[in-house]
């Protein structure tokens, strides 16, 4: 009990020291972290349920700022709120109900799912479209979106995972489990195809169980889906799904879509009931339903707790189990339910040791608990592996693995396997001999045996194993052939042989004596023995040998002899001729022509002798590579003895074969003289014979697997100790040279290392810099510093700090740098006036002459020639020039050899090149200005710059640089003004702000006739040409001298030109632009001359006429256009063109001017001194357009005060207030018209252009009107209300809706919004909530004017999605009458005669549609004989007393201003009756039995139906009619077959065949067989039968009685039962399946089964009361006679008695303090009484202690 000892006297001092040390350590860590104080306690949760937020604060203990945040958040109260709690956002909105908004109280409803700012409190006034942001932030814990767990904290939306943790991205899986792996459910998908019949109109598609998720069904076809549900409480329900919509079915949301060709059903889930999806037959065609959903696995394995320990002391163990648990009913069920799901894997039992305390000495032995098992733990034991099933090519071997247990005495017994499941079971099967089997490897072919004609060639074929060694075991059947014929194209003139010359086996096999003998295999084959001796001693004799059919028995590895017919293939010869040498001194040469006579029929004497190789000669060299020659000898093939070479045919002698030898290099030696046989190396050209090959193939078989390491990779570090890696793979080099990558287990050698150290030397010392400190000041200019330490990385990889002298000198700029914050405010002056400012120049520069250097100020655009040096200056105020920074295309610029960033604030680019083009940005603190540089090519074209160089940031800066209005106009008009719809324009390339002026500058460069043209011709001339041109035109050189180096234009001037061009018609824009560009070029040049005082006086002319063209003002452009046809010359005809009015920009009007002259598109303000107003209107077109004027939409009434001038201008003399309005010039010709307006106001008062007409739109997607009228349109269109205003100064336009002011852009309702642009109001996707009065108010200093337009939304007639209202109306009109709803496609209602019916016309629309009824296309009122009534505002039609037959088609036509809708339905009166059809076919073709039977049909409206419908209807009387009553032709008549003569093995059966004739009277008489033979072939009268084999069951004798015990002294014995023929041939068992099979198993008496369970007496109970007492006994299986223990499995036929039980399970009396266990004395001795569990059980003993 060490934990309870009192501390030693010195302990408090040690604790105090430890606390002080800990405090220092914590304080040092805090110093590094910025001196933060500890986090404070968590605040109260912002919500009590539904997920809220809590925060904790900390404070900074330093006087400086601390890094990090001083607040942190966490989620809390993550429990669902009760249903009555309501929405948290709605509660915050309702808190403002008692606060007046604009003087009025509203009931506020929440506006959720705002995509722009989800954490602001936006609420909508109930009953209105007013949406207001009542608070910038919602309370912490409010959900950002209704369908998300993300919550708002401090006004920002924070991500919350399904685990309710902030910042967590954990999501639910498809089963609804947070961060699950999808294993608790299974994906179910399938397809159903309807196969409905007339009697069955409904069918079940699929049953979707409770808890399923993500359900989707799609029905394609005419049928209809509907639902049946059943809750866990047994409540059933049904939903017909009659219309599209979202329904709540048993607390589950159902999304149903009913489309014309299909139906779609979606349910997110989880389902709260079992759903049965059914289909209802509505059409003749089949329907298909595809479904998919995730079904929960409701039965899962659940691991139990540990069982009680197997022993009370001394060490035991305890196990767990697994039980199948039903998640729906929350109860344990049978295991079979968990086996239904393959995903369910039953957990293995767990085992752990327990009660490891030694047993008390008084016990004697430990008590056994639930299991009769002993220490140590059970373990797996395995038998040795069996032999491999295959010697190569991959086999298997197995072993037995069992669970055993060892008791205290060391006895090992087998136990159940589950007791060893706490460790993995050893494998019982493993692969073996997975190497390849030996296979044949063929060598190269030898040369042909002949030099002419036909011969043979040979090759060596070896059997090679997987290691590349020569071995046996290859199949002889797959051996490649070793010889083949070869043909030499050289003809032979004296052939000796008729047959091909046959050579012997190649040298590589014979010379090395590798010939293989015949081997016995596992397949039966002929095996010859050795030949006998020759029968004669000289001359020709014979030899014999024995041929046996043998097979190798693999299991015994012995050879067995078989009958000869068991071996396939030809049998080898058993006799052959032999020759023993010449007799009586005969000549040893034989004549082949006499062979037949000498050998007495033997084929060829030459076969006795043949050439063979007999090894090799000695190597020609001892080192350095020599040659061996194969020795060829003539041998007797029978005796294998050498013979005279004359006995072998010379032409068959094999070729000379060589092989290399002694390839090792020779050791160094002294040079030898020529007299000592020195080898002299000569040039290859001096050798006449072909040079031998220096390369030959060798060892062409697979190499054994080996390790192949790759090259080492680069070292991970350049110094300081790094790591090198390489790949080491196990590969096998194949015979063809390729490599096969193998698993590492195939390589037996040790694997080379794949890692090694490298660069094990110290690194040079280097500076380690810290982060920059904060700026030294809070405003203005300060400094930042950072510290630096000198460190070195040692070869061990450890960094160490060294002396700073060992590091290179550190630049001053590396440790200190300036910083610039906001300018400090001066007393009494706002600080904003003292921020840095850059004095930019908004100019366009175009270089026209070569110049070495040009200076520019930022803020403009420069188009320059290459090789020009450029200096960019950035003039600033209130900012130090050394702090100015430069960027190019968004990248920071630094000084280089080509670009210089000077410390004085300017940038210098040396000799421009194409890569220098771009946007240069000068930054002075927060102030930024840009300068764009572009290059001009040699052909006066701009050098293109890649588009990718522009960044979005540069575009944003360029657009932001200009004022908003100018930027809007520029982007609106700059695209496509010059390009006329080029590809670049269509791609939006010209929207690049850096390319804004490229088009107009390109036109300026291309402009002919302006002074810059002199440059192009002057600079390309050499000096001689230039002098000559000067002599011819002295003014040209003088003009060039005064040309500027750069032309300068203001950006505003070019912006005005672009804006003016954008207002011109497209057909005139190109022509108009040429004049503007020419005028611009002239103005630029004149401006330069004026600045230089060089502008010529009217009397003098310095420049030639071509150099400075006559100046033409733009205002004269229209007149030149009008006369262009006459000026063209040649009488060429102009193309036809529709009218176009020229838009022009006039100078600003002077209010004091008495006469006002202006162009269209302007505003005229009438003052008191205005005497005349002249409105110009210039139009072009072919034919020439006619001009007429209107005022406020009405034609102008001309008078002596209002005049039309000859040039179609309108002049107003002495204008008065009645003349105020919008004057419109209309130009018209045969091709079209054009119109432009001009406003005339009184003293600058606002004027609004109005239109009092009513616009009705039902088809167009957009509507555009002037304010002042009424707009009636359908939903979903875009409505634009123009409010064109005029006034001086310009009037401000304000829009109102129902007298409420509208902002610039706002959402009116979900899916609709409005936008204000240049005084116009655009309403997108209008709906009913957009109806109202829209007012435009124009106001300026002189007054205001308001005009309004009423917007009415029309809804065309359509079928409502919810049909409950009209169904209730039908039910109220006629509760018991059949009814049908009309539909656009048509419906049908089948009625009985005399019934009445209700027809409903479901319709909705705005205004309410008018309904008209028709029958068969005629008005219902004119239908003859039809009683009808119309109710329910025309929606219900009742027709009464319908008679038989079809009633035709009824239709209802609904119409209003927005459109019409026709719906149809058909009424069919069903009446079934019997109809007599035509007579059926005669029942016989002859004789006396033929009759016609009339056929009855059940009809419904002339359609045949099931006869059951006519049950009860009167049947018409019908009588059969006789037919075909005549004599039949003769025919064969046969009797039945007789019984078979044998039951098996083949028998015969017969029948009688006669020829007979049937008379018309019905009598059949026999006739001659010839009469039947003429008509048909005589049937057979005999046939074979019972051809099957005669089989029977056969069986062997009973085996020994050694089967498993099934009772006392009772075991099982077996015998074999098989099917065979009566001849003893075994057949498959199926052949005897028709016969009763004899039994193959029977019970028998066995002495080994004379066993029974023997139990000992129960031990004493471990407790006298309570729930902890138990007792045990020993249970064992013993033999009845010997009474000795035997294995327990012999007693398994009887139940095993329990070996432990609870005892003394009675409650202990609390009042009596006594011992309840017999171990209390040990408890007292071990001093365990102070522990509660021992003190309670040993109350008496512990009380005494």
UniProtKB/Swiss-Prot annotation:
Post-translational modification: Glycosylated. O-fucosylated by POFUT2 on a serine or a threonine residue found within the consensus sequence C1-X(2)-(S/T)-C2-G of the TSP type-1 repeat domains where C1 and C2 are the first and second cysteine residue of the repeat, respectively. Fucosylated repeats can then be further glycosylated by the addition of a beta-1,3-glucose residue by the glucosyltransferase, B3GALTL. Fucosylation mediates the efficient secretion of ADAMTS family members. Disulfide bonds are present.
Origin superkingdom: Eukaryota
Keyword Amino-acid biosynthesis: no
Disulfide partners: 45-76, 49-81, 60-66, 534-578, 538-583, 549-567, 775-819, 779-824, 790-807, 874-922, 1177-1225, 1283-1336, 1401-1452
Residue ranges annotated for the PLAC domain, each copy included: 1709-1745
GO biological process, one term: extracellular matrix organization
Region called Disordered, residue ranges: 966-991, 1114-1137
Low complexity bias: start-end ranges: 1115-1126
UniProt-listed Pfam families: ADAMTS_CR_3 (PF19236), ADAMTS_spacer1 (PF05986), ADAMTSL1 (PF24484), I-set (PF07679), Ig_3 (PF13927), PLAC (PF08686), TSP1_ADAMTS (PF19030), TSP_1 (PF00090)
Glycosylation sites: 251, 310, 391, 451
Gene Ontology cellular component annotations, sorted alphabetically: collagen-containing extracellular matrix; extracellular region
Principal place of residence: secreted
SMART domains the record matches: IG, IGc2, TSP1
Name by which UniProt lists this protein: ADAMTS-like protein 1
Organism: Mus musculus
Gene: Adamtsl1
């Amino acid at each position: 009990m060490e934990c309870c000892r009192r501390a030693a006297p010195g302990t408090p001092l040690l604790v105090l020291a430890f606390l002080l040390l800990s405090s220092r350590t914590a304080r040092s860590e805090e110093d590094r972290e910025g001196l933060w104080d500890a986090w404070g306690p968590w605040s109260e949760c912002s919500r009590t349920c539904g997920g809220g937020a809590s925060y904790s604060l900390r404070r900074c203990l330093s006087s400086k700022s601390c890094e990090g945040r001083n607040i942190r958040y966490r989620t809390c109260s993550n429990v669902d709120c009760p249903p009555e709690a309501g929405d948290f956002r709605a509660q915050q909105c309702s808190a403002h109900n008692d606060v007046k908004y604009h003087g009025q109280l509203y009931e506020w409803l929440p506006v959720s799912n705002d995509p722009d700012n989800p954490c602001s409190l936006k609420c909508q006034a109930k009953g209105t479209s007013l949406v207001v942001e009542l608070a910038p932030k919602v309370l912490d814990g409010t959900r950002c979106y209704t369908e998300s767990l993300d919550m708002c904290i401090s006004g920002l939306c924070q991500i919350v995972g399904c685990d309710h943790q902030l910042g967590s991205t954990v999501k639910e899986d498809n089963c609804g489990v947070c961060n699950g792996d999808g294993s608790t459910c299974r994906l179910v998908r399938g397809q159903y195809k309807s196969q409905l019949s007339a009697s069955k109109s409904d069918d079940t598609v699929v049953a979707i169980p409770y808890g399923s998720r993500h359900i989707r069904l799609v029905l394609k076809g005419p049928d209809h889906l509907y639902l049946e549900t059943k809750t866990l409480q047994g409540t059933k329900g049904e939903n017909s799904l009659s219309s599209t919509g979202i329904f709540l079915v048993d607390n589950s949301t159902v999304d149903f879509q009913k489309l014309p060709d299909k139906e779609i059903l979606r349910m997110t889930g989880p389902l709260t009931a079992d759903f049965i999806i059914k289909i209802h037959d509505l059409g003749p065609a089949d329907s298909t339903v595809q479904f998919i959903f995730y079904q929960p696995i409701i039965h899962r394995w659940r691991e139990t707790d540990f069982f009680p320990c197997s022993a009370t002391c001394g060490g035991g163990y305890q196990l767990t189990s697994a039980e199948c648990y039903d998640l729906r009913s929350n109860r344990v069920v049978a295991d079979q339910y968990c086996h239904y799901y393959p995903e369910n894997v039953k957990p293995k039992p767990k085992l752990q040791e327990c009660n490891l305390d030694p047993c008390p000495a008084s016990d004697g032995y430990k008590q056994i608990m639930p299991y009769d098992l002993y220490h140590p733990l059970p373990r797996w034991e395995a038998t040795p592996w069996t032999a491999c099933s295959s010697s190569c090519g991959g086999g298997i071997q197995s072993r037995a693995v069992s669970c055993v247990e060892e008791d205290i005495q060391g006895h090992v017994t087998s136990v159940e396997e589950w007791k060893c499941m706490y460790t993995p079971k050893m494998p019982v099967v493993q692969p073996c001999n997975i190497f390849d089997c030996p296979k044949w490897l063929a060598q190269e072919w030898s040369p042909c045996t002949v030099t002419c004609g036909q011969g043979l060639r040979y090759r060596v074929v070896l059997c090679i194993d997987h290691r590349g060694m020569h071995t046996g075991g290859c199949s002889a059947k797959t051996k490649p052939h070793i010889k083949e014929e070869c043909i030499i194209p050289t003809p032979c003139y004296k052939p000796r042989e008729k047959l091909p010359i046959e050579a012997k086996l190649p040298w590589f096999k014979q010379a090395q004596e590798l010939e293989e003998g015949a081997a016995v295999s596992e397949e039966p084959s002929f095996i010859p023995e050795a030949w006998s001796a020759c029968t004669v001693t000289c001359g020709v004799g014979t030899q014999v040998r024995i041929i046996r059919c043998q097979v190798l028995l693999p299991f015994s590895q012995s050879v067995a002899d078989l009958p000869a017919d068991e071996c396939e293939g030809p049998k080898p010869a058993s006799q052959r001729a032999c020759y023993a040498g010449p007799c009586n001194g005969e000549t040893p040469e034989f004549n082949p022509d006499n062979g037949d006579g000498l050998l007495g029929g033997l084929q060829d004497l030459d076969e006795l002798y043949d050439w063979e190789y007999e090894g090799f000669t000695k190597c020609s060299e001892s080192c350095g590579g020599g040659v061996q020659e194969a020795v060829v000898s003539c041998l007797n093939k029978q005796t294998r003895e050498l013979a005279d070479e004359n006995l072998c045919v010379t032409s068959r002698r094999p070729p000379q074969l060589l092989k290399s030898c002694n390839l090792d290099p020779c050791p160094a030696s002294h040079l030898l003289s020529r007299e000592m046989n020195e080898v002299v190396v000569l040039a290859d050209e001096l050798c006449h014979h072909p040079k031998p090959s220096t390369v030959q193939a060798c060892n062409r078989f697979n190499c054994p697997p080996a390790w192949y390491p790759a090259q080492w990779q680069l070292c991970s570090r350049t110094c300081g100790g790094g790591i090198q890696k390489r790949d080491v793979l196990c590969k096998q080099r194949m015979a063809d040279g390729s490599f096969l990558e193998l698993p590492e287990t195939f390589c037996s050698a040790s694997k080379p290392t794949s890692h090694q150290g490298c660069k094990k030397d110290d690194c040079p010392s280097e500076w380690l810099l810290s982060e920059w400190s904060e700026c030294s000041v809070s405003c203005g200019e300060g400094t930042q510093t950072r510290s630096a330490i000198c460190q070195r990385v040692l070869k061990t990889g450890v960094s160490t700090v060294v002396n700073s002298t060992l590091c290179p000198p550190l630049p001053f700029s590396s440790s200190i740098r300036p910083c610039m914050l906001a300018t400090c405010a001066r007393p009494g002056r706002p600080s904003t006036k003292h921020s840095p400012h850059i004095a930019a120049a908004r100019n366009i520069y175009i270089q026209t002459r070569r110049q070495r250097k040009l200076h520019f100020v930022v803020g403009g655009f420069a188009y320059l020639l290459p090789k020009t040096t450029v200096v960019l200056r950035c003039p600033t105020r209130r900012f130090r020039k050394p702090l100015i920074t430069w960027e190019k295309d968004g990248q920071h610029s630094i000084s280089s050899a080509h670009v210089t960033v000077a410390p004085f604030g300017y940038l210098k680019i040396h000799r421009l090149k194409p890569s220098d083009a771009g946007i240069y940005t000068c930054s002075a603190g927060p102030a930024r200005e840009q300068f764009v540089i572009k290059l001009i090519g040699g052909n006066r074209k701009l050098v293109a710059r890649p588009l990718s160089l522009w960044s979005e940031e540069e575009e944003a800066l360029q657009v932001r640089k200009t004022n908003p209005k100018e930027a809007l106009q520029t982007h609106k008009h700059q695209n496509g003004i010059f390009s006329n719809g080029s590809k670049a324009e269509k791609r939006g390339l010209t929207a690049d702000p850096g390319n804004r002026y490229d088009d107009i500058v390109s036109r300026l460069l291309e402009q002919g006739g302006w002074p810059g043209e002199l440059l192009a011709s002057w600079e390309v001339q050499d000096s001689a040409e230039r002098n000559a041109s000067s002599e011819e035109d002295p003014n040209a050189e003088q003009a060039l001298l005064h040309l500027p180096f750069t032309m300068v234009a203001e950006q505003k001037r070019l912006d005005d030109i672009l804006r003016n061009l954008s207002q011109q018609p497209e057909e005139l824009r190109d022509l108009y632009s040429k004049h503007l560009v020419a005028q611009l070029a002239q103005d630029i040049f004149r401006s330069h001359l004026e600045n230089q005082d060089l502008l010529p006086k009217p009397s003098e002319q310095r420049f030639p006429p071509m150099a400075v063209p006559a100046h033409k003002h733009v205002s004269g452009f229209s007149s030149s256009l009008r006369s262009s046809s006459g000026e063209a010359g040649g009488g060429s005809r102009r193309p036809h063109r529709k009218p176009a009015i020229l838009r022009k920009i006039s100078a600003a009007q002077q209010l004091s001017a008495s006469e006002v002259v202006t162009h269209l598109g302007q505003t005229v303000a009438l003052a008191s001194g205005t005497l005349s107003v002249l409105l110009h209107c210039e139009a072009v077109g072919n034919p020439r357009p006619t001009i007429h004027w209107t005022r406020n939409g009405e034609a102008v009434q001309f008078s002596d005060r209002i005049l039309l001038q000859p040039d179609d201008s309108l002049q107003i003399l002495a204008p008065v207030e009645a003349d105020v309005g919008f004057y419109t010039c209309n130009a018209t010709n045969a091709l079209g018209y054009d119109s432009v307006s001009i406003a005339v106001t009184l003293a600058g008062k606002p004027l609004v252009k109005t239109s009092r007409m009513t616009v009705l739109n039902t088809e167009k997607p957009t509507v555009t009107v002037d304010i002042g009228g009424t707009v009636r349109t359908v939903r979903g269109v875009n409505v634009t209300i123009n409010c064109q205003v005029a006034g001086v100064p310009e009037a401000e336009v304000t829009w109102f809706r129902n007298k409420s002011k509208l902002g610039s852009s706002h959402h009116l309702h979900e899916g609709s919004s409005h936008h204000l642009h240049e005084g116009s109001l655009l309403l997108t996707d209008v709906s009913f909530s957009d109806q109202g009065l829209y007012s435009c108010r124009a106001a300026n200093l002189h007054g205001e004017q308001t005009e309004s337009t009423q917007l009415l939304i029309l809804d065309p007639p359509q079928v409502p999605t919810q049909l409950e209202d009209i169904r209730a109306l039908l039910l109220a009109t006629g509760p018991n009458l059949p009814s049908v709803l009309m539909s656009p496609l048509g419906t049908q209602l089948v009625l009985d005669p005399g019934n009445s019916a209700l027809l409903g016309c479901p319709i909705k629309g705005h205004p309410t549609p008018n309904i008209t009824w028709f029958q068969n296309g005629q008005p219902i009122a004119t239908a003859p004989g039809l009683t009808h009534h119309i109710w329910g505002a025309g929606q219900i039609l009742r027709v009464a007393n319908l008679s038989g037959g079809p009633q035709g088609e009824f239709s209802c036509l609904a119409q209003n201003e927005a459109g019409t809708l026709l719906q149809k339905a058909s009424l069919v009166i069903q009446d079934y009756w019997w109809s007599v059809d035509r007579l059926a076919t005669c029942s016989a073709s002859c004789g006396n039995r033929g009759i016609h039977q009339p056929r009855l049909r059940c009809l419904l409206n002339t359609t045949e139906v099931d006869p059951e419908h006519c049950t009860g209807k009167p049947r018409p009387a019908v009588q059969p009619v006789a037919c075909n009553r005549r004599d039949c032709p003769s025919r064969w008549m046969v009797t039945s077959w007789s019984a078979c003569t044998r039951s098996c093995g083949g028998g015969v059966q017969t029948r009688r065949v006669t020829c007979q004739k049937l008379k018309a009277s019905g009598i059949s008489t026999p006739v001659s067989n010839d009469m039947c033979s003429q008509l048909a072939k005589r049937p057979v009268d005999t046939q074979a039968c019972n051809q099957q084999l005669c089989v029977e069951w056969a069986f062997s004798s009973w085996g020994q009685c050694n089967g498993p015990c099934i009772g006392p002294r009772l075991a099982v014995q077996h015998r074999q039962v098989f099917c065979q023929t009566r001849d003893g041939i075994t057949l498959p068992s199926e052949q005897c399946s028709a016969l009763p099979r004899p039994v193959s198993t029977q019970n028998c008496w066995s002495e080994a089964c004379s066993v029974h369970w023997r139990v000992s007496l129960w031990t004493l109970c471990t407790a006298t009361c309570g729930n902890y007492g138990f007792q045990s006994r020993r249970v064992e299986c013993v033999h009845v006679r010997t009474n000795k223990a035997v294995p327990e499995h012999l007693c398994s036929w009887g139940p095993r008695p329990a070996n432990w039980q609870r005892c003394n399970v009675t409650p202990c009396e609390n009042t009596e303090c006594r011992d309840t266990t017999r171990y209390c004395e040990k408890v007292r001795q071990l001093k365990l009484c102070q522990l509660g569990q021992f003190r309670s059980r040993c109350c008496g003993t512990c009380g005494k202690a």
